[in-house]
From Swiss-Prot:
<dbReference type="Pfam" id="PF07992">
    <property type="entry name" value="Pyr_redox_2"/>
</dbReference>
<dbReference type="Pfam" id="PF02852">
    <property type="entry name" value="Pyr_redox_dim"/>
</dbReference>
<dbReference type="GO" id="GO:0003957">
    <property type="term" value="F:NAD(P)+ transhydrogenase (Si-specific) activity"/>
</dbReference>
<dbReference type="GO" id="GO:0004148">
    <property type="term" value="F:dihydrolipoyl dehydrogenase (NADH) activity"/>
</dbReference>
<keyword id="KW-0520">NAD</keyword>
<dbReference type="GO" id="GO:0050660">
    <property type="term" value="F:flavin adenine dinucleotide binding"/>
</dbReference>
<keyword id="KW-0274">FAD</keyword>
<dbReference type="InterPro" id="IPR036188">
    <property type="entry name" value="FAD/NAD-bd_sf"/>
</dbReference>
<dbReference type="InterPro" id="IPR023753">
    <property type="entry name" value="FAD/NAD-binding_dom"/>
</dbReference>
<protein>
    <recommendedName>
        <fullName>Soluble pyridine nucleotide transhydrogenase</fullName>
        <ecNumber>1.6.1.1</ecNumber>
    </recommendedName>
</protein>
<keyword id="KW-0285">Flavoprotein</keyword>
<dbReference type="InterPro" id="IPR001100">
    <property type="entry name" value="Pyr_nuc-diS_OxRdtase"/>
</dbReference>
<keyword id="KW-0521">NADP</keyword>
<dbReference type="GO" id="GO:0006739">
    <property type="term" value="P:NADP metabolic process"/>
</dbReference>
<dbReference type="InterPro" id="IPR022962">
    <property type="entry name" value="STH_gammaproteobact"/>
</dbReference>
<keyword id="KW-0560">Oxidoreductase</keyword>
<dbReference type="InterPro" id="IPR004099">
    <property type="entry name" value="Pyr_nucl-diS_OxRdtase_dimer"/>
</dbReference>
Amino acid sequence: MGQKNHFDVIVIGSGPGGEGAAMGLTKGGKNVAIIEKESSVGGGCTHWGTIPSKALRHAVSRIIEFNSNPLFCKNNSSIHATFSTILSHAKSVIDKQTRLRQGFYDRNQCTLIFGAAHFIDAHTVAVKKADGSIDTYSADKFVIATGSRPYHPKDVDFGHPRIYDSDSILNLEHDPRHIIIYGAGVIGCEYASIFRGLDVKTDLINTRDRLLSFLDNEVSDALSYHFWNSGVVIRNDETYDKVEGTSDGVIVHLKSGKKMRADCLLYANGRTGNTDKLNLESVGLQADSRGQLVVNANYQTQVEHIYAVGDVIGYPSLASAAYDQGRFVAQAIIHGQAAHLLTEDIPTGIYTIPEISSVGRTEQELTAAKVPYEVGRASFKHLARAQIAGKDIGSLKILFHRETKEILGIHCFGERAAEIIHIGQAIMEQKGEANTIEYFVNTTFNYPTMAEAFRVAALNGLNRLF
């Protein structure tokens, strides 16, 4: 094999995890190649996941804002848009993101190889190009960052024109008046917000007893109420018995005996790691039943020189976490170990309408652990900035230790929640006595701002102490 086909590290997949690893390794002086099976970089995050869904959400939330503001919708006039119409906005954002990320690799002289990779042996991969040709490449180390795809149960016909998953929904060409979303996880709830915001009748089937049960209960309840108030029908503790595609829609038969009918179905219940085409057996690796790889604290698989990051290793399955994992692996490969361990308190951003974000522990976790905590709350309806913007739905909640005043968890529901949370996260991550709720009382905030919610919540919480 020619020297030009040998690299220090080969990264498989150009999503956030692969990008983080490749950029860190290249800047560290390593000769790096990144292999991408699609025709452009960015991975599922850019093309089917985070970027398009958030671009859709933004467009829908602006339409809702316009239609609910009497300053704009005079004489009962309102804006109406369809899903297929606002998809064009999402596609323009995808194009911008793709060009931006392509530039990263070009500027850093990271070799880009387009094609589907699979292992031949422990240090060699074959890449099948779009024209059918196959090239082989070798490396000292590998980083698997192939991401995940929607889970397809065998008894659901995803070839039917009215049955979609969270990838294929972005190719929706007809404009449904009624949609059933099966699966009320993060993806299902985000799309429920989008479709209901477009005035599409939305039924959300939840296989659990509450929405997003990993959240603080109050936040989960707030989302449930907001969905109910906006007209989303939630069916908790339900599982399908049969999904029947018809000529003009779909019928979902539930095991409880209920039947539901709509113009189309979005199946959003679970994801599978993209490992089945990698020929992992040739290197002595085996994925679990969900296609995911097991890694150690350094993100090494059972084969020491092969690492894995991002959705392909499962939890937390966040683009932000995947990027950090990739950077961590780059440090581990370059220096033998990473200088800093990744923080365990990863913020969660859920882009429903309104947004949800949290970091740290929930009330139910603290109660179960018998931690003496107190709660500070700020309602957005009491903030001048929220009143000005007409975004007064939501609240911020700070959980802190009664005795040390250490911040233990922050939970936010409302406009810009995913941005607001980082102010609290920055203080939470301080060491020792620097992590204190009193910081927000002793700091001057710009006025009027949404960030002021931290001061209001801190005062509210401290006033509860005795």
